[in-house]
């Protein structure tokens, strides 16, 4: 079985040390957090001492559309993303996950934005950090950058596929380049990006497990779920126990389909 992981901010009701203890108790060997986390130095040290790997960082995505505008705001966004790449290198985090654009009506992609992404990807390659582009709403924007940057990887987000692009499947297109996974569930209603635990919603996770098994990805089965009001009746301990059961169930299904193909 691939190792299990969960986003570090999955449960903010407990402090970092308590969260790490709960992760260890429930078999989570890896995690990730934002590349601009104000506590990145301290958290990286705590996780390292606990033997929990930091698989990747998620770059800031608020104002990501500014990357495509010929404005100083676009330059500022590039600087924030570049800082994230440099933080990954500084703390030996191999992958940074990046959104290409945001919203239903993002700006048209063009030379200004591509020049900025050129600089970002070049800096990442210089520092040995892999850029992974994540599926959001606009397949065309993602496909352009995946084609434009052949060394970039893909971050497969199961929840986004269901609630932002119903009926569309990303793994048949980019599965061979998968380097990160954001596993979470939702109601499969358009724009309902609930980020609940696997099997608590209506996402077709059986298909996701089958497609992941068919890909070369052997990295962490990483959940991007949060203890929201959906779990208000659960204690942190109960939430982590539920998370372990759900994520392990998905990992078992990946193993099942992989064994079938041998």
Description of each model-found segment:
Residues 1-5, 13-24, 142-153, 162-262:
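Histidine-acidic metal/acid-base catalytic patches
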Residues 2-8, 31-33, 54-59, 96-98, ...:
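Hydrophobic faces of well-ordered beta-strands that scaffold small-molecule active sites
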Residues 8-16, 30-43, 65-67, 72-75, ...:
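Acidic-and-aromatic substrate-binding clefts and catalytic sites of carbohydrate-active enzymes
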Residues 27, 51, 92, 128, ...:
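Residue-level detector of structured alpha->beta connecting loops
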Residues 42-50, 116-124, 170, 207-212:
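Catalytic-core regions built around general acid/base machinery
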Residues 68-153, 163-165, 218, 237-246, ...:
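Active-site acidic/histidine proton-transfer and metal-coordination neighborhood
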């Amino acid at each position: 079985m691939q190792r299990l992981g969960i986003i570090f901010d999955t449960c903010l009701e407990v402090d970092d040390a308590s969260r790490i203890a709960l992760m260890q108790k429930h078999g989570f060997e890896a995690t990730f957090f934002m590349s601009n986390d104000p506590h990145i130095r301290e958290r990286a040290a705590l996780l390292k001492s606990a033997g929990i790997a930091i698989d990747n960082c998620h770059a800031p995505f608020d104002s990501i559309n500014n990357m495509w505008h010929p404005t100083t705001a676009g330059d500022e966004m590039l600087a924030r993303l570049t800082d994230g790449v440099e933080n990954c290198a500084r703390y030996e985090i191999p992958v940074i996950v990046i959104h290409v654009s945001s919203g239903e009506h993002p700006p048209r992609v063009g030379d200004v934005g591509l020049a900025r992404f050129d600089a970002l990807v070049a800096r990442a390659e210089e520092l040995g950090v892999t850029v992974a582009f994540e599926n959001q709403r606009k397949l065309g924007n993602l496909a352009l950058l995946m084609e434009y940057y052949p060394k970039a990887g893909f971050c497969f987000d199961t929840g986004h596929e269901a609630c932002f692009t119903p009926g569309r499947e990303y793994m048949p297109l980019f599965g061979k380049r998968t380097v990160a996974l954001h596993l979470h569930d939702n109601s499969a209603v358009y724009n309902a990006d609930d980020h609940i635990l696997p099997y608590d919603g209506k996402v077709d996770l059986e298909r996701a497990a089958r497609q992941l098994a068919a890909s070369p990805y052997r990295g962490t089965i990483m959940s991007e779920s949060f203890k929201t009001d959906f779990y208000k009746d659960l204690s942190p301990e109960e939430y982590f126990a539920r998370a372990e059961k759900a994520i392990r169930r998905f990992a078992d299904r990946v193993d099942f389909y992989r064994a079938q193909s041998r």
